[in-house]
Amino acid sequence: MEIASQEDPIPINTSYGNSGGGHGNMNHHHHANSAPSSLNITTSNPLLVSSNSNGLGKNHDHSHHHHVGYNIMVTNIKKEKPVVIKYKECLKNHAATMGGNAIDGCGEFMPSGEEGSIEALTCSVCNCHRNFHRRETEGEEKTFFSPYLNHHQPPPQQRKLMFHHKMIKSPLPQQMIMPIGVTTAGSNSESEDLMEEEGGGSLTFRQPPPPPSPYSYGHNQKKRFRTKFTQEQKEKMISFAERVGWKIQRQEESVVQQLCQEIGIRRRVLKVWMHNNKQNLSKKSNNVSNNVDLSAGNNDITENLASTNP
């Protein structure tokens, strides 16, 4: 019993060359792993052509089994350049204590000792530390993040953001210089809705009103109401304050309430008025009383002298 005769060989048939007839069912089985895009791949595989592949026949089955052995050629690998750090001119300000700006003119850092020693951190020209010199790195890609040199941003008049397949217009913050005493009309009202829906499914953000200028606070605030007193009210308040010693006592609460009802003011107004006028009016009343006492004493002295002299 021959086992080999019972095994059917796997048909690997292809029509390689000029085939004049039509192809039947073509089954392409690609078992090769995909190679990276940065690699150039060359294939070297002999094509197995069967003896009965004449390129003709209606039901001729072409099955390409690409079991390919790859010869990989690596070409696009970038070699990293060695990073070289250099220290250029000295930037130390020798006149910083005097509020000026003066540099020593050293153009490049020159170490004072061998590499790895402490002396290697000191410049032999200007005797300054290495950190005072401008550092320059070679072999390193430089990236600049500047808001003024960004070519990938849309123009500042209209900035759009992607938000779940919708375009959102986002206005830029506006810097407003407001004159003294001028504020926006919407600054005192509540802020409106920040988002409203427009046509086309887009969303627009409304910028809230800017805060008022700090110079306008003193001009737009309401003036504090100042109570004006009549001459009669002033006289009664002065006499009461002199009687209680310019200080309201708790035991005199009934007298205070009676005075407030009589002259038509509130207790707090009377208390504030006594506090504000305590120094000035109390001194004036003391001076007047002293002058009255002195004049009365002088009159007594003159009367005594007149009685003694016949």
Swiss-Prot record:
Any one GO biological process: glucosinolate metabolic process
Polar residues bias (residue ranges): 39-56, 292-310
InterPro entries, alphabetized: HD, Homeodomain-like_sf, Homeodomain_ZF_HD, ZF_HD_homeobox_Cys/His_dimer
DNA-binding residues (ranges): 222-285
UniProt KW keywords: DNA-binding, Homeobox, Metal-binding, Nucleus, Transcription, Transcription regulation, Zinc, Zinc-finger
Gene Ontology molecular function terms on file: DNA binding; protein homodimerization activity; transcription cis-regulatory region binding; zinc ion binding
Domain observations: The homeodomain differs form the typical one by having namely 4 instead of 3 extra amino acids inserted in the loop between helix 1 and helix 2.
Function: Putative transcription factor.
Protein name listed in UniProt: Zinc-finger homeodomain protein 3
Species: Arabidopsis thaliana (Mouse-ear cress)
